Amino acid sequence: SQAVCAMIQRVLQAQGLPAGLIGFVQGAGIEVGVGLIRHPLIAAGAFTGSTRGGAALQAEANARPRPIPFYGELGSINPLVALPAALAAKGAELATTLAGSISLGCGQFCTNPGLLVLVDGPETDAFIQQLTPALAQQKPHPMLTAGMRKAFDAGVQALVDAGASSLLQGEGVAPAPGPQLLQVSAQRFIEHAELREEVFGPSSLIVRCASLAEVPQVLAAVGGSLTVTVWGADEDTAAHRAIVRSATQIAGRVLFAGVPTGVAVTAAQQHGGPWPASTSPMTTSVGDAALERFLRPVCLQDAPAWLLARGGVPC
């Protein structure tokens, strides 16, 4: 962060822009973020982090004498629905791809596929047999902080305590965790909110549905997500329509191929979603439209000629 800030300052100087255009504040405690949100000269806030931290900062933004916009990107479990048709066609290839996505960056991507929604059947049984060893071969690097590693271990244990069974308990080498794969029934997932908590790290929870009809119910229980991935919905069927409809209702980005961990910075990107994925699902925190979060429209009615000549910018 310090190196990037130094580079930014050099660019500002080279372009003749004010040195204070972009600032850098560093600190380990929550008081740093709270202090920034409370500062009277701050006109808007943005945040990427935990649901708990984002909710606290949003409350601070709303508690100001003059509340300010707050754009928080919070928790997301990013369901990946792998339908039997896709697994039958290329299950082994998809298992390898998915294992890499789960462990990418030690699972510390906000778009990490933390929930795998599968439908009972021979294709699913075979896929799990392919995914488990593929994931076991992954060697995650250490997490960003010791606190994050501790939270990861606690999160995995919380899933077990809520009724999930472990399919893979990768043995990490401290301070790096091992990959984890767990499994639970769709009904239990729907009934127990603890199973829907984000576990930030190299793990994924398989939710097994008894039929295609249960898939939309599982997605609805998630509530909000940055992404939903749907593999195998290539045919126009009533079941596929229902699944895709549910996906669009809870996510900002719905993928029909690939994995969600890649987030392209493009005009078409939508990186946000209903709570708890973000505090403002109408906006994106990645892509061209992300700049619009910090712009405010102003109408200049019957403006004088001098102001029009300046393009509406008074000074």
Segments (PLM) and residue ranges:
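Short catalytic-loop micro-motif centered on adjacent basic/acidic residues
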Residues: 21-24, 44-47, 227-230
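Short acidic loop-to-helix transition motifs that present clustered carboxylates
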Residues: 27-31, 52-53
